[in-house]
Amino acid sequence: VWENARDWLRYDLLDSVMNYDFRRHCRDFFALGRIDAAGFADRVTNMVLRYPEPYLRAQLNLLDSHDVCRFLSLCGGDERRMRLAVVFQMLFPGAPCVFYGDEAGLTGVTEPEYRRPMDWENAEGSWFDFYRQVAGLRAKYLNGTERFTVLAAAPQSRLFGYALEREGLCLTVWLNAGDAPCPLPEAEEAERLWEQNASHEALG
């Protein structure tokens, strides 16, 4: 199901679908820059509210599949943009789906390219380590019952912030999809769990 799957997600039909809307929104914000943070927040919030909670948690959230060009290619080879999308994929309600080769940095625009065999020589390089780190955050802190709330998504801004909350946990995520560093909002009693391209004052 390539579009809104609400009509299919019923007890007598399907329990989950491949969430191509998730990929589409990530493509337009992180990879292509077609929408600003406010537009991304609107799309993602609509996606969250569209499905009953049990179905939302079961959505197969993908960035790549055998039917679409590789996300890293959509990013023009910009690894930073791809990594932002992967962080969002791993730290968002649903089931993150990693298409083979993404953890090795595979690229491809045409069908023979994005379906080419796995690059085993580079299977455990920097991309593999990155996926392992972000997946480790998900495994350590999330259990699938968290509520998703947008914290920051201003018009014409490329800084997107959100929270995942449940009893005993408030995990905030800040993603700067712009080219310039962004100041981080001050947070009292907040522990930094993991960061990339960030200082104590700004997010690069």
Language model features by range: what are they?
Residues 80-91:
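Short, hydrophobic/aliphatic alpha-helical segments
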Residues 11, 15-19, 27, 59-60, ...:
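Generic secondary-structure boundary/loop-capping signal
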Residues 42, 77-79, 93-98, 102-204:
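Carbohydrate-interacting/catalytic domains
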Residues 53-77:
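Active-site clefts of carbohydrate-active enzymes
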Residues 47-49, 85-87, 149, 159-162:
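Generic recognition of flexible, low-complexity loop/linker segments
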Residues 1-53, 88, 107-133, 165, ...:
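Active-site-proximal helices and loops of the catalytic beta/alpha 8
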Residues 7, 50, 59, 138-139:
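Charged, low-complexity, helix-prone segments enriched in Lys/Glu/Asp/Gln
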Residues 67, 90, 94:
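Hydrophobic/aromatic-lined pockets within catalytic cores
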